[in-house]
Each structure stands twice: as C-alpha cells, then as structure tokens.
Regions:
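Acidic/aromatic-lined carbohydrate-recognition and catalytic surfaces
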Residues: 1-121, 125, 129, 140-169
Length: 169
C-alpha cells in the first residue's frame, strides 16, 4: 500500500518517526522488550536532506544516488514493481536519471560510492548505540546494481551483508 511504502521511505535515519514518539519513548519500550528495527539502506526518501543535497550538488548527498547513463543495460532487471525504473531529476549538474527500485519517492542509494557505505555503517552503529539488538534488512537483495544483470542478489550485496554482520558481532 502507499502508506506502507511511505513507512519505508526514510527521511532521516537518526530520528524516530514523530507519529510514534521519540528516542525517550523508544528507550522506555526498549527497557521492557528486545527491539528490532528496519534497516532501510537500499533507498531513502526523495524528501530527505541527502536527496535535496544531491540535487543541489552539496554534501552530504552529492554522489549518494545511482545515476543511470545510456550505457547502463537495464534489460535484465528484476523488480517487484511495474512503475518506471528511472526517475528524471534536474540537478545542479544537469538532468540525471536516477534508479528507483520501488517508487519515485524512494530513490536508490549508490553503494559503489564508499561514502554511502560509510553512512550505512554510521547509521547501523548509531542504532546499535540505542540498544537495538535485531535488524530486518529491508530490500537488501536490491542493494547493488550492475549493468546487464537482474540487479538482485548480486555478490556485492552479499559481501555488504557480511560486513554488517561483522559490525553487529
């Protein structure tokens, strides 16, 4: 549903959805139960600061999203949506076609950029510091993209999951 998609369209990775309270309320809950969080690192919201900064050519955000050129072969891509794969946006660097696995309000991050990986690790470490013990890796199978492939369950994605597990251990 649209509401569920919005739930997974992260605007700020370090904040609790205000409709659910804040970190103080979370800590009260966490004192009574072991908690699990969705780690949504495949994509983030087109309303996020990262995306706004990407469009303006500023950091953090510049280079964070997957720009798809004409030479990228998407013919074998497998995804659970029938909406257009690419979203055209105007940026300070001109018109860009960005990868959107699920919807145009959820823009895929570019894990070929080491800064994006560092951000994902920083987010995970922050959530661990909040005593979250378990994580569901939302849409993780779609994390890495390689021209001419289905862009799902690629080796690079599995390597990244191994890295996340090492951090958790």
């Amino acid at each position: 549903s649209l509401q569920f998609r919005r739930w997974l369209s992260v605007i700020d990775y370090l904040q609790v959805n205000p409709a659910l309270g804040g970190w103080a309320e979370f800590q009260q809950l966490n004192a009574q139960f072991e908690t699990m969080a969705d780690l949504v690192i495949n994509h983030c919201s087109a309303e996020s600061e990262w995306f706004k900064n990407f469009c303006a050519g500023k950091s953090p955000g510049a280079g964070y999203f997957l720009e798809v050129g004409e030479d990228f072969d998407t013919s074998a891509v497998v995804r659970p949506r029938s909406s257009p794969l690419l979203r055209t946006v105007e940026t300070s660097n001109g018109t860009q076609n960005l990868w959107c696995t699920f919807s145009h309000d959820q823009v895929d991050l570019n894990f070929a950029n080491p800064e994006v990986l560092c951000e994902a690790v920083r987010i995970l470490k922050f959530l661990i510091s909040k005593k979250i013990k378990y994580f569901r890796l939302d849409a993780i199978a779609f994390l890495w993209k390689r021209s001419g492939t289905p862009c799902v369950h690629l080796k690079e994605t599995h390597e990244l999951v191994k890295l996340l597990r090492l951090i958790l251990e």
